[in-house]
Curated annotation (Swiss-Prot):
Residues 212-223 have a biased composition (Polar residues). One of its GO terms (cellular component) is Golgi membrane. It comes from Arabidopsis thaliana (Mouse-ear cress). It holds the Pfam family Methyltransf_29. Residues 54-223 are annotated as: Disordered. InterPro entries: Put_SAM_MeTrfase, SAM-dependent_MTases_sf. This is Probable methyltransferase PMT24.
């Protein structure tokens, strides 16, 4: 536009004057050109396109990170924690001073003209067209494809750099070191070509990427820098603090709500041991016990655990003579005894089998409930008989007893038979066991025993090993008479009473009826039959009622027929699913089979071999949204157990899980789970969080995930990509190690490992101050 103005003036001036102006302009342009050339030659690294180079660095970094994760996952050592902001600065500095990259770029610039540097190499033979200004008009189709595939890499390059404490660190307070050197160490390595790597991290053509046109970013920001800054802002907006609570490292939010407990009018029915969740889920992280170490592997953990992990000795002092637990140097040891089996649980287990062979451990009897479990040695040794025992006891009835059980690798939970139903469906347990469980079954119309009747499968057994069975004191005789009257009115048949001479105890074995004949022939309707409108499967926060649910006699419905023997039962499609529609829209039986095959494939081809999980450390597993229990079924041959959780707003598939010989529980993930901190080695969530975020605060849910997962434990999430992104930001803010990300068709997979990191600041939870 300026030259156009001068041309209009030229017609009014003399030719000599115009020549002078022309010479001045030419000289000026030459000087400017020389200055630009000298600047470019003297500092070649400054002319490198930061944006293009950043993208190249991103892809290289992600490739090397992915190779490290996929090939070297067996290593037990993981990168230390690293501050995210420092990470970005380091990356930028490395790019600007990388001699290899600088050399390649500079040599290319010296041999090409300015016009040639703006062109894109015709690597694929398609050619590039330019418009009148010399700019590229269209890119090759192959490069457009690479740019789309590269989007995931550019967004996750920073996040794929590990931010975890050392994987071999055993104590929480150790110093953290910066070990992030993956990109430099792996630069130039050849990517292994596998189907998974193509789906997750497409390789791209590095040579082609580095020859892209170098258009200086100047004062303009790049999308990569903007995205990195936004991610840092979002992550830093979550400022984690340690929970300052009376329970310290043993904090269970819904069981340590002292504000609610102090307001109770009565504790006669153990109301103070029931769940009282705070109005808002805590968003702080529970502290670690001083000297906490990684849990001992199963099966050694059944015999001993680290004292520093659960530094409680009261139970050893009170119950040591009954071989519950003893102190032994740096360990707490468990001789395998109990109040009713001082000489070992296995002898007691075999005694029960001999007393009534129809029990058939691990065949007919697969899933049992152990009430008032002590330290759960009974359930721990039933694994040797292929039996799953879910043990429960009130929190702190005996100091840390449930916590001991879980640390040993034995299924257990904090719960109480108080005023509400147990969080299980009706008619699911093959056997229920009570060994000196201190529950007054006979009082208040037998309300508590009737709750067991609800949970017990028709034809199932109730094993009562308590002093009224074999002692003749006045109190014991009175309880026995009351119990006999109640069980007869409930139509339970006393199958046998046997005495264990070695342990000097006895057991009475009852069986629940498989028909309603006895109920209909009773002379008195006491206890009364439940109303037809009373759903025996309704269990979440439902008050107890002293009534009997009729058993199902229709063979096409659940409960009328005993399940297949174990292990066939885990793969057998329940007959009663025939007339129902499945969760995924197909006929239920077809749905069940497809789900079973799907999880077998996922577990065998991905989880067991492709994620770098050391399964020898995995004992306590939770499926946070279980559906049919396919995930747990696929893991049945491993030496572990799975707590299957069916959220209260999901289809009620928990009875199907029990039918398969597995167990589980109902739960609302907007509240804390009734377990101690650091009790699970692996948490699995399949499309849980996308539904939770509609009604829960995900920060509170993730604080709960952190609470129940052990340091160095694994967290696997499958969900839509938006939700995966949110979860990834949160785990990164807690310094967890992102081990793997995968995306396809809008769905994502995230695998992370919890670190040892704890915040330095504290947050007082007023409801948890005693």
């Amino acid at each position: 536009m300026a030259m156009g103005k001068y041309s209009r003036v030229d017609g009014k001036k003399s030719s000599g004057y115009g020549l002078t102006i022309t010479i001045v302009l030419i000289v000026s342009l030459c000087l400017v050109g020389a200055w630009m050339f000298m600047s470019s030659w003297s500092a070649p690294t400054e002319s490198i396109d930061f944006s293009a180079n950043e993208r190249t660095k991103d892809v290289d970094t992600t490739k090397s990170d992915f190779k490290s994760e996929e090939v070297d996952r067996g290593s037990k050592s993981f990168p230390d924690e690293k501050n995210e902001e420092t990470e970005v600065v380091t990356e930028t500095n490395e790019e600007k001073t990388d001699p290899e990259k600088s050399g390649e770029e500079n040599s290319g610039e010296k041999t090409e003209s300015a016009e040639e540097r703006k062109e894109f190499d015709d690597k694929n033979g398609d050619g590039d067209r330019k418009n009148g200004d010399g700019e590229k008009d269209t890119e090759s189709e192959s490069d457009e494809t690479k740019q789309k595939e590269k989007t995931q890499l550019e967004e996750s390059s920073e996040e794929n750099k590990s931010e975890d404490s050392n994987g071999t660190e055993e104590n929480a307070g150790e110093s953290e070191e910066n070990t992030e050197k993956k990109s430099e160490e792996n630069a130039g390595e050849t990517e292994e070509s596998t189907e998974k790597s193509k789906d997750v991290f497409p390789a791209g053509d590095q040579a082609e990427i580095t020859k892209e046109s170098s258009t200086g970013s100047g004062a303009w920001s790049t999308q990569l820098v903007e995205s990195q800054n936004e991610k840092k802002a979002q992550v830093s907006s979550i400022k984690w603090k340690v929970c300052n609570v009376t329970a310290g490292p043993d904090y269970i939010p819904c069981l340590d709500n002292w504000q609610a407990i102090r307001k109770l009018h009565s504790t006669k029915h153990y109301e103070h041991r029931e769940r009282h969740c705070p109005e808002e889920s805590p968003r702080c992280l529970v502290s670690l016990p001083e000297g906490y170490k990684r849990s001992i592997k199963w099966p050694k953990s059944r015999e001993k655990i680290w004292y520093t992990n659960i530094p409680h000795t009261k139970l050893a002092e009170v119950k040591g003579h009954q071989n519950w637990v003893k102190m032994s140097g740096e360990y707490l040891t468990f001789p395998g005894g109990g109040t009713q089996f001082k000489n070992g649980a296995l002898h007691y287990i075999d005694f029960l089998q001999e007393s009534y062979p129809d029990i058939a451990w691990g065949n007919r009897t697969r899933v049992i409930l152990d009430v008032g479990c002590g330290v759960a040695s009974f359930g721990g040794y039933l694994f040797d008989r292929d039996v799953l025992a879910l043990s429960f006891a009130p929190k702190d009835e005996h100091e840390a007893q449930v916590q001991f059980a879980l640390e040993r690798g034995i299924p257990a939970m904090s719960n109480v038979m108080g005023t509400k139903r147990l969080p299980f469906p009706g008619s699911v347990f093959d056997l229920i066991h009570c060994a000196r469980c201190r529950v007054p079954w006979h009082i208040e119309g037998g309300k508590l025993l009737l709750e067991l009747n609800r949970a017990l499968r028709p034809g199932g057994f109730f094993v009562w090993s308590a002093t009224p069975v074999y002692r003749k004191t006045e109190e014991d005789v009175g309880i026995w008479k009351a119990m006999s009257k109640l069980t007869k009115a409930m139509c339970w048949e006393l199958m046998t009473i046997k005495k264990d001479e070695l342990n000097e105890v006895g057991a009475a074995i009852y069986q629940k009826p498989m028909s309603n004949k006895c109920y209909n022939e009773r002379s008195q309707n006491e206890p009364p039959l439940c109303k037809d409108s009373d759903d025996q499967n309704a269990a979440w926060n439902v008050p107890l009622e002293a009534c009997i649910h009729k058993v199902t006699e229709d063979s096409s419905k659940r409960g009328a027929v005993w399940p297949e023997s174990w292990p066939e039962r885990v793969e057998t499609v329940p007959q009663w699913l025939d007339s129902q529609e499945g969760v995924y829209g197909k006929p239920a039986q077809e749905d069940f089979t497809a789900d079973h095959e799907r999880w077998k494939t996922i577990v065998s081809k991905s989880y067991l071999n492709g994620m770098g999980i050391d399964w020898s450390y995995v004992r306590n597993v939770m499926d946070m949204r279980a559906v049919y229990g396919g995930f747990a079924a696929a893991l049945k041959d491993l030496k572990l157990w799975v707590m299957n959780v069916v959220p209260i707003d999901s289809p009620d598939t928990l009875p199907i899980i029990y039918e398969r010989g597995l167990f589980g529980i109902y739960h609302d993930w907007c509240e804390s789970f009734s377990t101690y901190p650091r009790t699970y080695d692996l948490l699995h969530a399949d499309h849980l969080f996308s539904s939770l975020k509609k009604r829960c605060n995900l920060v509170g849910v993730m604080a709960e995930v952190d609470r129940i997962l052990r340091p160095q434990g694994t967290f696997i999430v499958r969900d839509d990509m938006e939700t995966i992104g949110e979860i990834e930001k949160m785990v990164k803010s807690m310094k967890w190690n992102v081990r793997m990300t995968h995306s396809k068709d809008g769905e994502g997979l995230l695998s992370v490992q919890k670190s040892w990191w704890r915040p330095t600041e504290a947050e007082t939870i007023q409801s948890a101050i005693a």
